[in-house]
Amino acid sequence: MQSSTESGFYRRPPFEIVNPRGKSPVLLVCEHASRFIPEELRQLGLDDEAAREHIAWDIGALALAEALSARLDATLLVANYSRLLIDLNRPLEAPDAIPEHSEIYPIPGNQGLTAAARQERVASIFEPFHRQLTELIDERLEAQRAPRLVGVHSFTPKYRGETRPWVAGVLFGKADAYANRIIGGLRQSGEAIGSNQPYVIDPLEDMTVPVHGDERGVDAVLIEIRNDGLRTPQGVETWAERLAPWL
């Protein structure tokens, strides 16, 4: 039976900051870094295989974000909980902020969630993460170090049976000049690099770029790497090497 409250479940810190004194203007964020779900929630009713799948986290994104942080000497904000508990790249009003279904998977532990349990996730995970991201941006703006906000994500080679042709994509709203520089640099390889593909930034469905970037006049993009390119340490380092000069 689902508990009416989740008070005390979220003992792990909601985020970690890697390289807090990084000198790069790039500020990295990895909202879907972790698949961690507190033991009390029994994987939200998912079996082990589903709980390891891309629905729970962005496979390889954390390793890539850490590699970029090291190469660029950039600060990185890392989320410590699964996106299935609450998606940190969704406004709270978005229908899938706490998803009841994800692709082909029902999420039993999110169905019929009480207002108290929902608020516990908001207060324990969502609000502290976004408060910290706001503070990191504030610090840079106050020091007249205009940041470039870069979200690091991954996507699946196939979605609902349809093959995705891109090896990577860059998603953006108002930061078209910055985004196009990155896209142009990556396209020098001759591979398919998506411009606002495989997703499109939508202020009603996205948080990082519209709220922390566009609304504040900060250049902000999401980098999406197809996750079959991030399955090995060599793949991660290859992508970090390719991305770093253009960020």
State what each model feature region is.
Residues 1-149, 154-247:
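N-terminal catalytic or cofactor-binding beta/alpha core of small enzyme domains
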